[in-house]
């Protein structure tokens, strides 16, 4: 066992870090924190970790390592999305609620995914009804933190976005990019993220 989970908790993400990276964590209710990993002390392998974000009734939708000149790409359950320069997210206190990353309304719904990206990548959006759509990241609107985004995928009635993935542009043939729909049914690790907690382990 490499982490102790609390009741009703689950492991969400694992990332390799340098020891001085900046971390982004986002909740489904539209908030995001950015903090330096140096604020998380090194712990034993089976520790539960310390709080990374106050979810305030939401759930953790992911975490990313901050890279210069990248965008934060946010996708909501009703198929809306946007990208925002990472510099718009100021450093906040680890364990706090963070800053608003999207204006959540009945129209766009809760956040289901966020990624840090650059314009050389493609975005795959997957719905709970088995639809996949691929979009070039450079075609997605760049907007401020507090906007609701624009519609990226038309959903069937009662369908929602279930997950997303960032892929290299050459991984899939040109027949499946820019909005075409497809229908179908040992490195060293140092950071572990559960529903709202974070643990740092020495990799040596």
PLM region descriptions:
Residues 193-195:
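Generic detector of N-terminal low-structure segments
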Residues 197-199:
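Short, low-complexity segments with poor structural confidence in diverse proteins
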């Amino acid at each position: 066992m490499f982490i102790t989970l609390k009741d009703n908790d689950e492991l969400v993400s694992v990332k390799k870090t340098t020891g001085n990276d900046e971390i982004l964590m986002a909740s489904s209710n539209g908030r995001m924190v950015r903090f330096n990993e140096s604020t998380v002390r090194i712990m034993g392998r089976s520790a539960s970790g310390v709080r990374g974000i106050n979810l305030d009734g939401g759930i953790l939708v992911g975490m990313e390592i901050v890279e210069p000149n990248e965008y934060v790409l946010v996708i909501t359950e009703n198929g809306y999305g946007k990208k925002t320069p990472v510099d718009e997210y100021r450093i906040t206190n680890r364990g706090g609620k963070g800053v608003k990353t999207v204006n959540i309304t009945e129209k766009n719904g809760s956040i289901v995914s966020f990624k840090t990206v650059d314009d050389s990548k493609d975005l795959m959006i997957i719905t709970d009804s088995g639809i996949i759509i691929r979009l070039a990241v450079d075609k997605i609107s760049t907007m401020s933190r507090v906007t609701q985004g624009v519609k990226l995928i038309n959903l069937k009635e009662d369908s929602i976005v279930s997950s997303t993935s960032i892929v290299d542009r050459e991984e899939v043939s040109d027949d499946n990019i820019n909005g075409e729909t497809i229908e179908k049914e040992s490195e060293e690790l140092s950071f572990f993220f559960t529903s709202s907690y974070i643990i740092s382990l020495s990799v040596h």
